[in-house]
């Protein structure tokens, strides 16, 4: 069995997702925690990519672009061999508003939005994309996207099983 790991340091940054999430620690501890993850995992052969966030809520802000740039640059001081990503998700009609944030990543992570790949490629031809979360029911469609478009480099299914955290999502 071979596994590919996207090593993700934060589920959120400064905006509240839950009562006890990382937002209260982000300003003071983000670089320390990022450094600890990088140094702990940099020799693991399964880790192919570093992720600096998952569906962060402040993704439209200029401040988020700055934080992403700072974290990406910091990662590159420790490990220049692996790409940096972040899982972006949106249910807005103005997906293009995320282009400044997406431009801070080597691979742009799309959660449930790989159908935007072709139009995004036409708009931003240099962008490399992967689906960082997808439904199991979409695995064949997503596999075809990887096969047909060289700028789509993979698909990660979330999740193939049901569990208490998000029951029903594995269907």
Language model region names:
Residues 1-118, 123-126, 133-136, 140:
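Active-site mouth of glycoside hydrolases
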Residues 84-86, 130-131, 152-157:
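Acidic/polar loop patches that form or flank catalytic/metal-binding clefts of enzymes
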Residues 126-127, 148:
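Glycine-rich, phosphate-binding/catalytic loops in enzymes
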Residues 143-171:
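Aromatic/acidic polysaccharide-binding cleft in carbohydrate-active enzymes
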């Amino acid at each position: 069995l071979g596994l590919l790991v996207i090593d993700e340091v934060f589920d959120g940054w400064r905006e509240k997702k839950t009562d006890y999430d990382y937002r209260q620690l982000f300003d003071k501890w983000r670089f320390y925690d990022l450094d600890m993850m990088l140094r702990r995992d940099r020799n693991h052969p399964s880790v192919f990519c570093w992720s600096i966030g998952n569906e962060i809520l402040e993704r439209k802000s200029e401040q988020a672009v700055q934080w992403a740039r700072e974290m990406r640059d910091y990662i590159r001081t420790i490990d220049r061999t692996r790409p940096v990503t972040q899982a972006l998700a949106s249910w807005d009609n103005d997906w293009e508003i995320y282009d400044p944030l997406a431009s801070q990543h080597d691979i742009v992570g799309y959660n449930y939005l790989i159908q935007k790949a072709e139009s995004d490629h036409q708009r931003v031809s240099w962008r490399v994309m992967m689906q960082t979360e997808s439904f199991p029911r979409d695995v064949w469609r997503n596999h075809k996207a990887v096969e047909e478009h060289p700028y789509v480099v993979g698909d990660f299914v979330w999740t193939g099983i049901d569990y208490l955290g998000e029951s029903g999502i594995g269907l």
